[in-house]
Amino acid sequence: MLTGSRIPNLKELRPLGTTVRILFVFDPRRVAILLLGGDKEGRWQEFYAEAIPLAERLYEEHLDELRREGAI
């Protein structure tokens, strides 16, 4: 879990040798959902302050769509 997130299984990919971060989550179907990515170089704290709320909103939209489709 990323500190400050309401999503218990929100994780980040960290490609080796870069400051790029990709936030992802496994949805209730156990499908990996890549929510957003960005380069946090020089923005170590600000990156998460902006990225986590956006990732949470995107994930909620994804879950809403799954509910509308009857998938969950």
Model feature map: region roles:
Residues 5-12:
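Short, hydrophobic/aromatic-rich segments at coil-to-beta transitions
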